[in-house]
């Protein structure tokens, strides 16, 4: 990481930097292209190889450079921004910055997010000279960083020649949007200010032609699916996380309305479909599903999964009671019907839209759900001053998001996954977490990026262990004037790891978290931090955060017992532990 990692001007009041060599420069072209695809904030850490490029990014009127405290958080911020805006970008320096941001790029790749990672590279004259440069591993071959990025990006552009720079940049950015994956752009440090005829002042706007379904394949898939679903007695509909990639959320809602099926969402699809749908029955997550949801899904004689990802986490250690012969699996460009045929070149949005027009309405599964459903009981009342329980915390968070203008809820890897899944999201409230990659600390940077992209406040639930990984970019939230509400759950360690496999390594040093945030605040910007230990203090803190301090970044440290976990985490942890502990197959 660069020693000057906290550098860069305030993103709200960045000094105007005039490019040194006219308008038709590489740096100016890259900046305009970013704005054109919807990026207005680039999350950056300055280093000597990217400084001139940052000058040109800052000079673009529609672009802000948000200086982050480290490259990992810059990458996480671009991840969060992409979730809200559809595309995100970060800028770092060569190798020391690139390898630091790489973990975040891996997370964005796994979550199918278009993220443009820009790296300031060596001077173009140094390529092929056998020179050894700083910020390298001491070899004259500068390709080590590129080779690290290749498995984690869908396109890589090494721009060290102006003649093909325009084409490489345009192709990289368009590929990120089209494939919904990260891309890597390395720009030699001596090129951003150099004019070239290919960098016109107003580049031709991007036009990405939509992927079209093969009509014969589409109709064959529809016929097979309708025959499969219409003969079922109690079919159900389940949303998966690839609805985002396919941009098929609206088509899924149309199908839910037309079919009458009971509707569930996989955990990583929470927030992608409205939970206000009339036949929504909750989260399907195997043994840790919303009450009565798994019973309805797993007992169905047919289920349509739209954009699922089945891994060891989403299947609770491969323990879901699903059968392939009962499933229609719709992926962004493919449909598979039971044990029968698979239909390629079928776009999910087209398929779901057409299916909604032809499907036969069947409310049997939802009718069964209504018969067996028993409302959850009331939480026991807390005694005055009684130590705060985590379930009481989330009772109050549920009330808060229902009554305040909250744009999204973000859940950090850990018990917050399970507690936040139980929140019933109001109309228009998003939900984000990183289930496939599961990198602890992700939510701090992602919160920074997401909040920078939206107008409404964002709520984040973060465990103490995760917060210690990436805490310093609370500083950047303050510099950006953000108003998020952070609930820091202090239970003394890595609780999710404890429930998978306990050991002394899961205990962490306790911090004075409120004191830390106040030190970061240092009287600059709007920030309010408090610690709560009982329900009365929590109620007062939420009232203040949504009232007098509604224009501030609010940090509420919630002190909880180390063994206060959700029952879902206990169940999930034991099943994932069993999956991890399988003995080697006989050789």
From Swiss-Prot:
State whether keyword Lyase applies.
Answer: yes
GO CC, sorted alphabetically, is: cytosol
**What is catalysed by this protein?**
a 2-oxocarboxylate + H(+) = an aldehyde + CO2
Residue ranges for the region (Thiamine pyrophosphate binding) are 415-496
Q: What is its EC number?
A: 4.1.1.1
Residues bound to substrate? 48, 135, 497
What Gene3D superfamilies does the record point to? Answer: 3.40.50.970, TPP-binding domain
Q: Which UniProt keywords apply?
A: Decarboxylase, Lyase, Magnesium, Metal-binding, Thiamine pyrophosphate
What's the protein name?
Pyruvate decarboxylase 3
| Species for this entry | Oryza sativa subsp. indica (Rice)
State the organism's lineage: Eukaryota, Viridiplantae, Streptophyta, Embryophyta, Tracheophyta
**Gene of this entry:** PDC3
